[in-house]
């Protein structure tokens, strides 16, 4: 009790301190959240003030963007520490982001809607800001691409990386397109008078667009790389999980049971198994030995002649009593492969002669007593052996041999002890028949010296993974089962004609039996390149793509499994079916593939075939696991080769040139008449397509390059077909057809490669351009009615000018090239005249573009001058309405308006003359009426002058004023003009001094003030004795005289 008290006293402060620390952390995080919310509120108020112009101090958008980014960083930190505050934090961030977007839109609209004099500068600033934004976005995207490229090496989940990269790809596509469209729109709206500055901005935008295209392509290639990695990983997983690629299945060895199985024996066997399982570190659970029926109803498959306890037949009881003193002994085991290769061994076994007699009634009753007979009929022994739990036998039986493990269990068939098995007889007949036609490779495989296979005497249980000791024991008692398998590829050519022989063994139903003793062979074909040429044509079309010619991922994995060597051959004669065959007398063992032209689908296809053939032609089988392979070398004595065959082979192969590629023996067999006919038809169709395209007049230089590549590829394919036909199968294809096709392709290839074709194409292009330029009078048919029409016409003429300039440079380069001097030496004079025609056309188009640009500039000046006159007249009228009678200012404004009217009249005359010279006489009637607009402004200015003169007119005295009769309305304008002239004459007459003094009150008031000042000075002098004004006072007396 004291110990617990002391323990609690010691541990309590630590708990308290930890709780205090936790509370401090929570409080600090809560304070951070409060500070973040306050910052959000402050920033939102600043954004709203800037948005509605509520503050005298303006804050730039860049500063607000920096503050927003700082808040986003702090938000990420807070979310990492306190996830429960996610809703409030994200809500405020979204609100601030929306407000910032509105502020940016308003800022951009203000920049775009500036004063007319600042339009160019504002457009340039907006363009520079947009380009800066585009560059920042490009930097960010490049950084994210580099991060994804680094993640390829370390990212375990490639699917997640692929989804991230696809999202980035969509962002690059959409965001980049929006930004580039914005830049193009700004440049289109900005019409700068400085052409060099405009060209610089267009060059900058083009560079940014190219950079965006490069980033887009890099992102797309990264997506393809990730997809290829995923496909490769999936294919490797499929190949690792394929049971055909691992070693042969471990057969369960026979066991023998002597007498009654006691409890001690059972315990010893279980102890041995536990030790073995512990050594191999294999865990076997109870679910591994689960049967779909009860344990007491189970009947061992290996013991087909032992009765079940539930069977009460008297005949079977009698049989058990007669066999009480007999024992079980081990027999020869079949640990080979379940493909029929050990049928000879079973045929030599005579254990079937010693079977215990059994009647059909006894067998039928025993089967009826078993509740699992249907299960046995449908499940193979290899599948059941993993679930088998041996049952204790309560009696001893006579030593009897067992059948092989590699069989189907079929209890419904009758079996008589006196009956000889026809399967064995057929096998022995096949072995003894000397007249049986066999291939040389088949006879070679029968020269193997077979060993006997001794079964294991120790009871074993099949685990989920065999141990190394088990593999060693099985390897000692096994034979080299690869002899028949190795020669299987050579015999397969004879077996292909009989599909029934391909799918079943010798002991099949065709020998009138219902109990096959061997499992059916798997329907695997030849281990050669036949399936490659069925799915992937070597002579693939030039129009095909990589995705069309290459098989999908699953098919590629299957192809890799079939090409991989599964068993180790005893010698290189057994490895002949692998395809490593020399096609020369020297015996080169390395396969070579002729390289096709670059950047063609044929080259990629040949490269893949080369890799697959190299994997197939390996001499040794790859190790699929760390466990030792249960293979064994045995003695092999091949028969002496026939020299006549080799001599014929050498004579045939020596006819082939040294430049021929070494190919597989089966290629000529699979490249038969059907494949050759298909190659010829496709090549002819390609030839027709290319010839038809060449006949068209609009074929350009890139198309000629493509045609050259197509011709070279087809020519190479026809050459290879001729070489194969002449080397292996002299009679399977007519040589004349291929030679004629080759000559046609060769002529076409030479005609395309010759520089004369390119020169003629350029000549046609130059002639078409000059013909188009000669009809440039069609520009006069354009109906120009507005400034937009002038801009469109100017763009069209500028594009034509650029095209002519580029083609003129191409023509000059062509005339200066050596190929032209060699081919068209006599036509140099004609080409010189064409070059002069280009110079004249460029000069004419340049002058037309210059005149159109001047018209456009004058039209812009016309519009701006109209705006200036309109604004000045509105100002003058507003002053007159407000009563501000500053006559001098108004007169200056009137004079300025008159000068602008004179310049506007000059512009009107120039625009009318220029547009009339550009257009035809028929369209000159539809020109804009500039004189009508000029008369409108002139009349408005005249009315404004009359109004000003009426307001500043001086009235005459009433005594002198003469009242004329009431004027008629038609004479109102003339009377106003006469009154203004009289006033001007009156104002111009000189006045005398007396009349001026008498008429001016200001002069009178000034004179009165001067008199009063003089009187005040006299009064001051008389009172103080000093004159009025400043005086000098001597300190030490007056100076000496």
Curated annotation (Swiss-Prot):
Residues 456-465 have a biased composition (Basic residues). The KASH domain, which contains a transmembrane domain, mediates nuclear envelope targeting. The chain crosses the membrane at residues 1005-1024. GO terms for cellular component: meiotic nuclear membrane microtubule tethering complex; nuclear envelope; nuclear outer membrane. GO terms for molecular function: dynein light chain binding. Residues 613-626 have a biased composition (Basic and acidic residues). This is Nuclear migration protein unc-83. Its main location: nucleus. Component of the unc-83-unc-84 LINC complex which contains at least unc-83 and unc-84. Within the unc-83-unc-84 LINC complex interacts with unc-84 (via C-terminus); the interaction is probably required to recruit unc-83 to the nuclear envelope where it then recruits dynein and kinesin-1 complexes to regulate nuclear migration. Interacts with bicd-1 and dlc-1. Interacts with nud-2 (via C-terminus); the interaction is direct, and is required for recruitment of nud-2 to the nuclear envelope. Interacts with klc-2; the interaction is direct. Keywords: Coiled coil, Developmental protein, Membrane, Nucleus, Transmembrane, Transmembrane helix. Residues 258-283, 453-498, 613-646 are annotated as: Disordered. One of its GO terms (biological process) is post-embryonic development. Cargo-specific adapter that is involved in nuclear migration during development and thereafter. Component of the unc-83-unc-84 LINC (LInker of Nucleoskeleton and Cytoskeleton) complex where it interacts with unc-84 to form a bridge connecting the nuclear envelope to the cytoskeleton which allows for nuclear transport along microtubules. Within the complex, connects the nuclear envelope to the microtubule cytoskeleton through the kinesin-1 light chain protein klc-2 (most likely within the Kinesin 1 motor complex) to regulate nuclear migrations. It is found in: Nucleus membrane; Nucleus outer membrane. Residues 785-816, 931-951 form a coiled coil. Changing residue 1039 to A: Localizes normally to the nuclear envelope of hyp7 hypodermal precursor cells, however hyp7 hypodermal precursor cells exhibit failed nuclear migration. Disruption phenotype: Viable, but with failed nuclear migrations in hyp7 hypodermal precursor cells. Hyp7 nuclei are mislocalized to the dorsal cord of L1 stage larvae. Predominantly expressed in migratory nuclei. Expressed in a variety of cell-types, including cells around the pharynx and in the uterus.
């Amino acid at each position: 009790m004291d110990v617990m008290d002391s323990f609690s006293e010691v541990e309590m402060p630590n708990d308290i301190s930890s709780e205090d620390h936790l509370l401090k952390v929570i409080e600090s995080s809560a304070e951070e959240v409060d500070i973040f919310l306050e910052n959000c509120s402050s920033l939102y108020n600043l954004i709203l003030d800037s948005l509605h112009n509520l503050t005298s101090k303006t804050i730039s958008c860049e500063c607000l963007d920096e503050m927003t980014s700082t808040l986003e960083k702090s938000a990420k930190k807070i979310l990492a520490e306190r996830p429960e505050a996610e809703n409030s934090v994200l809500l405020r961030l979204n609100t601030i982001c929306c407000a910032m977007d509105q502020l940016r839109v308003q800022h951009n609209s203000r920049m775009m809607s500036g004063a007319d004099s600042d339009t160019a500068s504002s457009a340039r600033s907006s363009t520079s800001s947009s380009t800066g934004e585009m560059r920042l976005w490009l930097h960010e995207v490049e950084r994210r691409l580099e991060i994804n490229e680094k993640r390829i090496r370390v990212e375990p989940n490639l699917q997640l990386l692929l989804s991230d990269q696809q999202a980035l790809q969509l962002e690059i596509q959409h965001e980049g397109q929006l930004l580039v469209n914005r830049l193009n729109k700004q440049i289109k709206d900005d019409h700068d008078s400085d052409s060099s500055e405009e060209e610089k901005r267009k060059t900058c935008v083009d560079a940014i667009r190219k950079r965006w295209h490069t980033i887009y392509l890099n992102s797309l290639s990264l997506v393809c790389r990730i997809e290829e990695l995923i496909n490769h990983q999936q294919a490797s997983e499929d190949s690792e999980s394929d049971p055909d690629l691992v070693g042969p299945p471990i057969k369960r060895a026979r066991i023998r049971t002597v007498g009654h199985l006691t409890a001690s024996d059972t315990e010893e066997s279980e102890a041995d198994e536990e030790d073995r399982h512990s050594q191999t570190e294999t865990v076997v659970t109870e679910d591994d030995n689960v049967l779909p029926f009860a344990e007491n109803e189970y009947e061992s498959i290996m013991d087909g002649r032992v009765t079940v306890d539930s069977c009460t037949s008297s005949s079977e009881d009698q049989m058990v009593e007669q066999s009480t003193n007999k024992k079980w002994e081990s027999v020869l085991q079949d640990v080979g492969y379940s493909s029929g290769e050990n049928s000879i061994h079973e045929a030599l076994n005579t254990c079937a002669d010693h079977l215990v007699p059994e009647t059909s009634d006894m067998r039928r009753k025993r089967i009826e007593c078993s509740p699992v007979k249907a299960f046995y009929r449908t499940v193979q022994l290899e599948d059941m052996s993993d679930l088998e739990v041996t049952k204790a036998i309560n009696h001893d039986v006579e030593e009897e041999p067992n059948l092989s493990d590699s069989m189907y269990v079929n209890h419904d068939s009758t079996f008589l002890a006196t009956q000889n098995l026809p399967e064995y007889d057929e096998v022995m007949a096949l072995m003894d028949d000397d007249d049986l036609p066999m291939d040389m490779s088949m006879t070679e495989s029968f020269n193997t010296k077979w060993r006997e296979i001794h079964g294991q005497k120790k009871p074993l249980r099949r685990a989920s993974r065999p141990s190394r000791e088990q593999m060693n024991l099985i390897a000692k008692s096994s034979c080299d089962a690869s002899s028949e398998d190795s020669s299987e590829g050579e015999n397969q050519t004879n077996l292909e004609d009989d599909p029934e022989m391909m799918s079943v063994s010798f002991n099949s139903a065709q020998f009138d039996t219902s109990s096959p003793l061997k499992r059916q062979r798997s329907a695997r074909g030849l281990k050669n390149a036949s399936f490659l040429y069925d799915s992937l044509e070597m002579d693939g079309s030039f129009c095909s793509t990589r995705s069309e010619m290459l098989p999908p991922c699953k098919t590629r994995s299957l192809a890799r499994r079939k090409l991989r060597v599964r068993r180790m051959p005893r010698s290189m004669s057994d490895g002949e079916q692998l395809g490593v065959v020399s096609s020369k007398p020297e015996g080169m063992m390395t396969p070579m593939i002729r390289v096709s032209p670059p950047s063609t689908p044929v080259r990629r296809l040949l490269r893949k075939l080369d890799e697959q053939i190299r994997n197939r032609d390996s001499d040794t089988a790859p190790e699929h696991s760390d466990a030792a392979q249960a293979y064994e070398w045995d003695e092999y004595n091949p028969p002496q080769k026939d020299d006549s065959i080799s001599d014929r082979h050498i004579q045939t192969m020596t006819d082939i040139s040294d430049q021929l590629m070494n190919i597989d023996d089966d290629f000529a067999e699979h490249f038969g008449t059907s494949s050759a006919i298909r190659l010829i038809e496709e090549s002819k169709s390609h030839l027709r397509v290319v010839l038809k395209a060449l006949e068209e007049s609009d074929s350009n230089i890139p198309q000629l390059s493509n045609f050259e590549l197509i011709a070279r590829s087809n020519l190479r394919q026809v050459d290879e077909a001729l070489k194969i036909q002449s080397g292996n199968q002299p009679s399977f294809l007519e040589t004349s057809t291929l030679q004629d096709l080759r000559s046609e392709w060769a002529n076409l290839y030479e005609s395309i490669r010759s520089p004369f074709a390119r020169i003629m194409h350029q000549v046609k292009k130059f002639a078409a351009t000059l013909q188009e330029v000669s009809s440039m009078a069609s520009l006069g048919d354009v109906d120009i009615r507005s400034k937009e029409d002038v801009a469109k016409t100017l763009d069209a003429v500028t594009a034509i000018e650029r095209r002519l300039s580029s083609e003129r440079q191409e023509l000059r380069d062509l005339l200066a090239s050596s190929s032209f001097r060699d081919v068209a030496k006599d036509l140099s004079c004609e080409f010189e005249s064409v070059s002069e025609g280009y110079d004249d056309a460029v000069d004419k188009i340049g002058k037309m573009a210059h005149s159109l640009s001047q018209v456009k500039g004058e039209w812009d000046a016309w519009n701006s001058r109209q705006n200036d006159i309109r604004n000045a007249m509105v100002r003058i009228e507003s002053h007159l309405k407000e009563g501000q009678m500053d006559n001098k200012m108004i007169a200056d404004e009137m004079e300025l308006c008159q000068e602008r009217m004179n310049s506007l009249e000059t512009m009107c005359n120039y625009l009318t003359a220029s547009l009339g010279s550009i257009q035809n006489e028929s369209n000159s009637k539809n020109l804009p009426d500039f004189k009508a607009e000029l008369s409108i402004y002139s009349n408005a200015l005249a009315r404004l002058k009359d109004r000003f003169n009426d307001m500043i007119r001086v009235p005459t005295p009433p005594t002198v004023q003469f009242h004329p009769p009431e004027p008629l309305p038609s004479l109102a304008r003339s009377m106003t003009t006469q009154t203004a002239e009289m006033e001007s004459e009156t104002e111009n007459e000189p006045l005398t001094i007396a009349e001026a003094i008498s008429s001016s009150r200001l002069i009178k008031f000034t004179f009165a003030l001067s008199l009063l000042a003089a009187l005040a000075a006299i009064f001051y002098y008389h009172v103080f004795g000093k004159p009025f004004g400043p005086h000098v006072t001597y300190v030490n007396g007056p100076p000496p005289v």
